[in-house]
Amino acid sequence: MSLQPCRPAPALILAHETPAHATQIEALLTRAFGPGRFSKVSERVREFADFAPELSFCALEAGQVVGVVRMWRVSVGDQPIVFLGPLAVEETERKHGLGAQLVEHACAAAQAAGEAAVALVGDVAFFARVGFAIAPDVSMPGPVDPKRVLARTFADVPLTGAVRAA
Ligand SMILES: CC(C)(COP(=O)(O)OP(=O)(O)OC[C@H]1O[C@@H](n2cnc3c(N)ncnc32)[C@H](O)[C@@H]1OP(=O)(O)O)[C@@H](O)C(=O)NCCC(=O)NCCS
């Protein structure tokens, strides 16, 4: 049996998104979430939240966007926090840890920036792996299963109240 030379896999880079990535990110989000994407309660949050590009990242492989995580500034009650989402990884790249890596990277950036907490709407089975737990006292601007409202705190702050504009 002869061994075939193979090309080294292109390195994965986590970088802040730029306007040049916008088209690829939109296409990835449409593939990942399908047509129901804009009916999610998280979209209602993003309508009033302030995008935080310095806390948001995309994963690039050979210049192609293969993952994205976006972060937004909001408040819960009077507490300023960060809202995470959308998070998506290209289907061919899943189950290699990239989703968790993107969340960790964005959370580390938020913590380094002095943010007290990150909240999101998602599956606890996935996000518990990266430090999130159900946030029972946080309410969303629309109907949602309360078991999907999650938070990860970096400080001992009360997370009680509605998610609203920062
Ligand atoms: C969720 C997502 C970002 C994970 O990306 P990823 O790169 O595969 O993540 P990781 O490799 O870090 O983790 C994969 C593990 O999470 C599990 N997982 C993925 N989505 C999950 C979910 N919704 N609920 C529970 N577990 C989930 C996978 O089965 C896998 O489990 P395993 O390690 O036991 O095989 C990716 O599946 C995706 O883009 N999904 C579509 C968009 C989406 O649902 N985004 C999250 C919205 S809140």
Locations of regions flagged by a protein language model:
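Short, low-complexity, intrinsically disordered N-terminal peptides in bacterial proteins
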Residues: 1-13
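Conserved acetyl-CoA-binding loop-helix of GNAT-fold acetyltransferases
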Residues: 89, 95-108, 120
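A short beta-loop-alpha structural element at the N-terminal edge
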Residues: 12-25
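Hydrophobic adenine-recognition pocket in adenosine-nucleotide-binding enzymes
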Residues: 17, 87-89
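Active-site rim helix/loop that mediates acceptor-substrate recognition in acyltransferases
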Residues: 22, 30-73
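C-terminal "cap" of GNAT-fold acetyltransferases
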Residues: 140-166
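A conserved beta-turn-beta hairpin within the catalytic core of GNAT-like acetyltransferases
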Residues: 74-84, 94
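Conserved active-site alpha-helix within GNAT-family acetyltransferase domains
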Residues: 112-116, 121-146
